[in-house]
From Swiss-Prot:
Location of region: Disordered: 1-117
InterPro entries, alphabetized: GAGE (IPR031320), GAGE_fam (IPR008625)
Ranges of Basic and acidic residues composition bias in the record: 103-117
Anything else known: This gene belongs to a family of genes organized in clustered repeats. They have a high degree of predicted sequence identity, but differ by scattered single nucleotide substitution. Their sequences contain either the antigenic peptide YYWPRPRRY or YRPRPRRY which is recognized by cytotoxic T-cells.
PANTHER family: G ANTIGEN 1-RELATED, P ANTIGEN FAMILY MEMBER 5-RELATED
Family indicated by similarity: Belongs to the GAGE family.
UniProt feature, compositional bias: Acidic residues: 32-45, 87-96
Organism in which the protein naturally occurs: Homo sapiens (Human)
Expression by tissue: Expressed in a variety of tumor tissues but not in normal tissues, except testis.
Record gene name: GAGE4
Protein name: G antigen 4
Function: Antigen, recognized on melanoma by autologous cytolytic T-lymphocytes.
Amino acid sequence: MSWRGRSTYYWPRPRRYVQPPEMIGPMRPEQFSDEVEPATPEEGEPATQRQDPAAAQEGEDEGASAGQGPKPEADSQEQGHPQTGCECEDGPDGQEMDPPNPEEVKTPEEGEKQSQC
């Protein structure tokens, strides 16, 4: 007697209906207007201090880009397609060239061998 194992076919399970959550109410922008208002500067603080963080942030951005150094520029075709030594190149328009006419192709002699793609 051989053991047949568990069947891989499963009957589709009945779909359970899930009721959508109840809506609390419409979302209104007026509810959030108090939280969105920017803080007003105090009398003791000059208004120029509020602009300093923006200037400091610009300075940090310049330093970060200078620390990365120049990016090496390489030909994208060389990175995307490694050459194996037997590569057929595309035509000048980037489209493949039509195969040559068989009547015009010369057959190589037995002594000569050509690599074919």
